[in-house]
Amino acid sequence: MKRFTLIIDGHNFFFRSLWSCFRQSSKTKILSTQKDIDAYEKKMMVDFCSVVKSVSPIVNDIVFIKDSHSWRKDLLLEHEYKGNRKKTQDNIDMLGFGEAVNNFTDTLVNFGIKVGQAERSEGDDLIYAWSNFLFESGKSSLILSTDKDLNQLIKCVNGIHIIQYSPVSNKLYVSKESNDIIKSISEHKEVQMENLFDELFTISIENDPFEKFVKGTDIEEVSPEEIRFAKIIGGDSSDNIHPVYFKRGDGETKSKGIGPKTVKKIYDTFKGKLGCEFDYHIYSNEDVMKMLCNIIYEIAKIKDDEFTKRMLLENIKTNTKLVALTDESIPADVIDNMVGNINEERLKKSVILSKITRENIFAKSRFKEYKSNIQFDSGTVRGAKGCDMDFIVG
């Protein structure tokens, strides 16, 4: 199997490193001192080296994705989109956080790592743009993130893969087609190999690095279109996106929405009536969307005089823009910005992965020298708490 380009979800990476260092406290604001900023920056460099080492046998290039101000926050009010995350951020000095992650990103640039960053582009958008560009160029991608929103990008066509790896759960998310190939490897079937100088594996199946990697992971087969559909219709509570039908409770009555089981019934019924291959293009077909509205009304048993099918259709359109990662759902200017970033960064030579060591990374940073003893002003904890981990997604 061909080697992958490793695409690292920077936002996800930043907060995994953060919560592996600091314990949330109502008394002490983290990253409010230079000592904490320095320590956090060093921790990210150490974690980056560890991440690369863990997947280096199966990758031959790296793209590190960094968020910018999201166009989605311009589409909805700031307090609505991802507004439920602000309480978690209250305990973080965001100026200190910004200084640390910017310094860390500068270190990656100094080292020659490709960095995906573009104006108005959220990390998910850039991961879509980069993985799609690589896919169309005949190159496979390994997305490193715990964010299940990115499952919608997973696919495999003609042996070109987009798969996702969660380092927290040690889980590999793959399409049915990718999983079939993995199963064939585990059954020790012949794998077509190409020239080693093209950085493809030409060795026996017993020594195949990919086989060794997947043997140490849990594999979950996912349906990208079903995941995208579920987030559009059922919303995404982690991003504060409501279902396409949602009525907030008034204290005496409970809030009403569309739960996962109902979304599944809607999906199965819609897929059965569609009569053609199910992909993201359907969301731009108004007649098909009207059919979907009728199915939602029927299965969700919506009886609300204040809620019309026209409102439902508009909610589907809005959620599609917020949730779906496609050229159709992302604004044209954002696409142009990301294409510009790709065209610039792809000209960089691939970094030799064996050179990504703590000593070499620190040498390119403002610290210049690696020291194993990293100290913090705030309390530290080895491994993040469950409540902390909720914030790293998205």
Where are these regions (language model features)?
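Noncatalytic, basic helical substrate-engagement surface that gates or grips nucleic-acid strands
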Residues: 2-144, 149-180, 187-189, 324, ...
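Accessory alpha-helical DNA-binding modules that contact the DNA backbone or grooves
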Residues: 192-336, 348-377, 385-391
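Common nucleic-acid-contacting/processivity interface regions adjacent to the catalytic cores
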Residues: 394
